[in-house]
């Protein structure tokens, strides 16, 4: 099919956002078909965009899409005194950091702020530390099914070895993978995206957000594809924002009709195909048009793309991009 009916450019431009699946009037799953074709190219023809081949090698060698050492996976936690599963405790929750949360400079700040919230509330948690490895999401969406399954089986073995029951993560991609795909490999857990966990803390009265720092600010929330369309969670992040004295404004395309940031499906790690406009620029312009002061995100990939978009539009001084964990932490003054 590829090159005959579908070009390589079309095949690899897909962000796996699943908007086509939602809109298809005859219930065809185009995203799944695209993924099958990517698998054929990668597994049978050893063919993939250059950037993705590098990602595959990095995950296989280092347990992350970037060329960082596995031993550096806890550098983000310097001076935070974060408990480890290997300490021998059996906590209520495992906080799954994810590769972006451990290595991406911008999202490491989000990881630290969420840890501060957990400590502030007194949540019984621990992390895997250097035992954690990439979830395999990027490998699977990019067609490298063998690498994904290797990562999944390895992670499930470690998680089950610690008898983990409840997992929290800030990454919607890892949230989706661990919740919906790890059960196929014997990994059955209660998995929470951090927006859901924060909403639960607010609903139970464990945190109260005065949000004075953001009083009367206009905030627009960008729905991550794998939190929203992928798992039907639209209310939790908005409920968290509603707990602050801010004015929430919606983008034209929101919730189930939200536009992808453009980073999913491996796009984060490769050059974009030629076109009139990159997806992240379209989404950034849509956010800017709301007149917002802050773009709230809840995904490391979305964070990168929206931040880059604001810089390209020379709006990064006027409009800020924060993860909801950062907004909550600032509201708690911790």
Which residues does each predicted region cover?
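Cofactor-cradling patches in redox/metallo enzymes
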Residues: 101-190, 226-334
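Iron-sulfur-cluster electron-transfer modules
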Residues: 1-182, 186, 201
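Short, surface-exposed amphipathic charged segments that create phosphate/polyanion-binding patches used
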Residues: 201-217, 262-268, 331-334
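Phosphate-coordination loops involved in phosphoryl transfer and adenosine-cofactor binding
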Residues: 90, 215-217, 292
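Ferredoxin-like iron-sulfur electron-transfer modules
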Residues: 1-16, 215, 222, 275, ...
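Short, conserved active-site entrance elements at the starts or edges of catalytic domains
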Residues: 189-197
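C-terminal amphipathic alpha-helical segment
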Residues: 203-241
């Amino acid at each position: 099919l590829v090159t005959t009916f579908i070009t390589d450019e079309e095949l690899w431009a897909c962000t796996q956002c699943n908007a086509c699946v939602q809109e298809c009037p005859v219930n065809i799953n185009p995203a799944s078909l695209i993924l099958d074709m990517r698998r054929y190219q990668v597994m049978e023809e050893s063919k993939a965009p250059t950037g993705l081949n590098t990602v595959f090698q990095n995950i296989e060698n280092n347990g992350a899409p970037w060329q960082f050492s596995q031993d550096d996976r806890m550098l983000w936690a310097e001076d935070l005194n974060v408990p480890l599963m290997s300490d021998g405790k059996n906590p209520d929750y495992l906080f799954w950091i994810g590769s972006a949360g451990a290595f991406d400079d911008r999202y490491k700040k989000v990881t630290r702020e969420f840890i501060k919230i957990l400590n502030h509330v007194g949540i019984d948690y621990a992390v895997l530390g250097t035992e954690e490895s990439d979830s395999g999401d990027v490998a699977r969406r990019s067609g490298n099914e063998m690498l994904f399954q290797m990562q999944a089986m390895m992670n499930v073995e470690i998680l089950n070895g610690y008898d983990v029951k409840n997992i929290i993560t800030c990454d919607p991609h890892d949230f989706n993978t661990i919740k919906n795909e790890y059960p196929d490999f014997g990994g059955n857990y209660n998995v929470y995206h951090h927006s859901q966990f924060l909403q639960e803390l607010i609903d139970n009265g464990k945190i109260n957000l005065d949000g004075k720092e953001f009083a009367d600010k206009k905030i627009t929330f960008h729905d991550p594809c794998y939190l929203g369309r992928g798992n039907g969670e639209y209310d939790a992040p908005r409920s968290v924002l509603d707990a602050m004295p801010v004015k929430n404004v919606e983008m034209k395309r929101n919730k189930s009709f939200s536009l992808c940031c453009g980073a999913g499906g491996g796009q984060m790690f490769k050059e974009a195909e030629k076109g009139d406009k990159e997806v992240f620029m379209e989404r950034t312009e849509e956010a800017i048009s709301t007149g917002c002061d802050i773009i709230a995100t809840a995904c490391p990939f979305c964070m990168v793309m929206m931040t880059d978009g604001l810089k390209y539009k020379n709006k990064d001084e006027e409009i800020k991009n924060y993860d909801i964990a950062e907004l909550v932490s600032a509201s708690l003054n911790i």
